[in-house]
């Protein structure tokens, strides 16, 4: 199945503790159907020190993955969450917003 949400897309969270937050997609984990969104689902990870790489240990905050069904792409024209469709334009497959047919 084609990816409706890709890296660097602006998305809004639809469900969960961060509902309503907006952010940029940093990574898409296609095999697990999850995305990592900037500033969303921030967790504290206990990091061991690694002298070989020069990393000090401690508690690090980082974004955790959330399920792709809990995010929707943000339409910049309307400022709201929108659905994505696919169509062929000049022999190329393009993504478009279903609300106003604008190409992403």
UniProtKB/Swiss-Prot annotation:
Pfam family, one: KOW
GO molecular function: rRNA binding; structural constituent of ribosome
Record InterPro entries: KOW, Rib_uL2_dom2, Ribosomal_uL24, Ribosomal_uL24_CS, Ribosomal_uL24_KOW, Translation_prot_SH3-like_sf
GO cellular component: ribonucleoprotein complex; ribosome
One GO term (biological process): translation
SUPFAM superfamilies in the cross-refs: Translation proteins SH3-like domain
Keyword vocabulary terms for this entry: Ribonucleoprotein, Ribosomal protein, RNA-binding, rRNA-binding
Source organism superkingdom: Bacteria
Record family assignment: Belongs to the universal ribosomal protein uL24 family.
PANTHER family named among the record's database cross-references: MITOCHONDRIAL RIBOSOMAL PROTEIN L24
Record-linked HAMAP family: Ribosomal_uL24_B
Function: One of two assembly initiator proteins, it binds directly to the 5'-end of the 23S rRNA, where it nucleates assembly of the 50S subunit. One of the proteins that surrounds the polypeptide exit tunnel on the outside of the subunit.
Assembly: Part of the 50S ribosomal subunit.
UniProt protein name: Large ribosomal subunit protein uL24
Organism for this UniProt entry: Idiomarina loihiensis (strain ATCC BAA-735 / DSM 15497 / L2-TR)
